[in-house]
C-alpha cells in the first residue's frame, strides 16, 4: 500500500501523503469488512513503528518525507556522541543508548544538513501520532514512543530542554506536542476524516502506543516474569520491569503502556525486513503467482525452506541490509554461495540469519 523510498544507501523514507491515503484505505476496508456499523464503534487508536521522524508545518502539511526506523543517515552524529561523552551524559536521564534512527539523531542531521526544512516545522511526530493528527487535527505525542527515542527524561517523565541541547536540538523544544498516556483521548474524528474513512464524526481517538508495546500486550506481556520476542523489521527481545535496568546490561529502557512499568528492550534492524527484501527483489514472479492463485507468498517461502535440510545448505546470510544496532554501516551478504545453490537455499539462509540475530 505504501512502498518505501530508498533514494540513497542508508536512507529509508515514505511519502507522508501516500502514507495517509494508505491508512485511510485500510481503515475504510476494516470498517466494511468487520460488518460493524460505524456508529457502534466506541473509539479508535493506533500503534506504529518506533523511532524515525515525521514533521509538519503550521498548516499541518508534511515538510519532508517520513523517515523510518531503518534509516541510518545520522550515523556520524551517534559516533561523535559516543566519543565526546554525550552518550554517558544523556544516559543519566534517558537510560538508553543512542541509535541512528532515533528522532534526536535524525533531527541533528537536519540541523546540519537541511536547516531550511526545520525552519518550517510546527510539530514533530512519530508515525502513529501523525496519522492521529490527520484524523483529529489535534497535535499530541505519546509516552511509549517518545520515551523510546531519547526525547524524554525518564526521571521526570517529561521533555527536558537540557537533554535536547546535549544533541544540539534545544531550539526545537517547542516543536514537540503535549505528551499523553496510551489510553488518553487525544481528539475526535473530524468530518473530513469521517468522509474519507467511513468512521463517524466525533468518534474518540486514543493516543495509542509504540508497536513493540502493542506486540507485548498481544503476547501477554503483563508481568515481570514474562519475555516477548518480536520478529518484525527489527529483531526485538523485551520484558517489562517496575524500574529501569541501568547496570549497563541492556540497551534501551522506555515507558510501557501499562502505567508503572518500563519496557526493557534489546533490538536490531536485522529481522524479517531482510525476508521482505528477498521477496521483493528475488521472488517477484512467485509473489504475483501467489496473488493470482489466492495464496500467501509465505506459504511458498515456508515450503521452500522446509525442503532444504540444514546440512545440505552450508550457506550463511548476514542480515545487515539495514545495518545493526551496534554497527549502523554494517552490510548484508551471502557467504559460501556456489553454483549448487538456488533461491531456496538462499531463502533458508535468510531465515537462519534472522533467527540467529535474535
Where are these regions (language model features)?
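Glycine-rich, flexible loop/turn motifs
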Residues: 2, 7-8, 37, 52, ...
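Short beta-strand-loop/turn "lid" adjacent to the catalytic site in phosphate-handling enzymes
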Residues: 8, 32-69, 97-101, 132-153, ...
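Active-site core segments that coordinate phosphate-bearing ligands/cofactors
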Residues: 82-100, 105-140, 150-170, 185-358
Amino acid at each position: 500500500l505504501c512502498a518505501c523510498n530508498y533514494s540513497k544507501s542508508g536512507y529509508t523514507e515514505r511519502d507522508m501523503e501516500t502514507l495517509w491515503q494508505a491508512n485511510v484505505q485500510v481503515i475504510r476496508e476494516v470498517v466494511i469488512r468487520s460488518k460493524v456499523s460505524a456508529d457502534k464503534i466506541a473509539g479508535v487508536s493506533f500503534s506504529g513503528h518506533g523511532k524515525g521522524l515525521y514533521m509538519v508545518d503550521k498548516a499541518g502539511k508534511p515538510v519532508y518525507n517520513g523517515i523510518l526506523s531503518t534509516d541510518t543517515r545520522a550515523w556520524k552524529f551517534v559516533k561523535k556522541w559516543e566519543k565526546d561523552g554525550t552518550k554517558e551524559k544523556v544516559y543519566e536521564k534517558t537510560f538508553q543508548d543512542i541509535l541512528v534512527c532515533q528522532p534526536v539523531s535524525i533531527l541533528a542531521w537536519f540541523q546540519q544538513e537541511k536547516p531550511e526544512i526545520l525552519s518550517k516545522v510546527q510539530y514533530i511526530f512519530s508515525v502513529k501520532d501523525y496519522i492521529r493528527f490527520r484524523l483529529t487535527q489535534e497535535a499530541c505525542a505519546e509516552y511509549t514512543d517518545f520515551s523510546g527515542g531519547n526525547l524524554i527524561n525518564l526521571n521526570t517523565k517529561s521533555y527536558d530542554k537540557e537533554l535536547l541541547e546535549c544533541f544540539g536540538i534545544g531550539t526545537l523544544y517547542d516543536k514537540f506536542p503535549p505528551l499523553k498516556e496510551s489510553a488518553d483521548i487525544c481528539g475526535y474524528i473530524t468530518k473530513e476524516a469521517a468522509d474519507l474513512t467511513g468512521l463517524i464524526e466525533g468518534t474518540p481517538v486514543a493516543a495509542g502506543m509504540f508497536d513493540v508495546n502493542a506486540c507485548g500486550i498481544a503476547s501477554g506481556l503483563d508481568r515481570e516474569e514474562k519475555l516477548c520476542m518480536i520478529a518484525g523489521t527489527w529483531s526485538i527481545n523485551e520484558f517489562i520491569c517496575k524500574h529501569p535496568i541501568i547496570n549497563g546490561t541492556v540497551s534501551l529502557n522506555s515507558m510501557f503502556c501499562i502505567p508503572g512499568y518500563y519496557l526493557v528492550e534489546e533490538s536490531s534492524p536485522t529481522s524479517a525486513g531482510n525476508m521482505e527484501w528477498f521477496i521483493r527483489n528475488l521472488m517477484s514472479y512467485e509473489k504475483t503467482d501467489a496473488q493470482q492463485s489466492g495464496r500467501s507468498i509465505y506459504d511458498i517461502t515456508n515450503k521452500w525452506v522446509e525442503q532444504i535440510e540444514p546440512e545440505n545448505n552450508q550457506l550463511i546470510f548476514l542480515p545487515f541490509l539495514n545495518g545493526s544496532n551496534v554497527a549502523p554501516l554494517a552490510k548484508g551478504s551471502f557467504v559460501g554461495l556456489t553454483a549448487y545453490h538456488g533461491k531456496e537455499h538462499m531463502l533458508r539462509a535468510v531465515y537462519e540469519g534472522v533467527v540467529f540475530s535474535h
